[in-house]
Amino acid sequence: AYRKPPFNGSIF
């Protein structure tokens, strides 16, 4: 997670 995505723990 770069900038707190909708899915916690995912890279978007």
From Swiss-Prot:
Q: Which family does it belong to?
A: Belongs to the FARP (FMRFamide related peptide) family.
Q: Which residues carry this modification: Phenylalanine amide?
A: 12
Give one GO biological process term: neuropeptide signaling pathway
On tissue specificity, the annotation reads: Expressed in the CNS and midgut but not in the ring gland, thoracic perisymapthetic organs (tPSO) or abdominal perisymapthetic organs (aPSO) (at protein level).
A single GO cellular-component term on record? extracellular region
- Lineage, top-rank taxon, reads Eukaryota
Keyword Manganese annotated? no
Q: What is the official name of this protein in its record?
A: SIFamide-related peptide
Main localization of the protein described in the UniProt heading? secreted
Keywords carried by this UniProt record: Amidation, Neuropeptide, Secreted
Give compartment(s).
Answer: Secreted
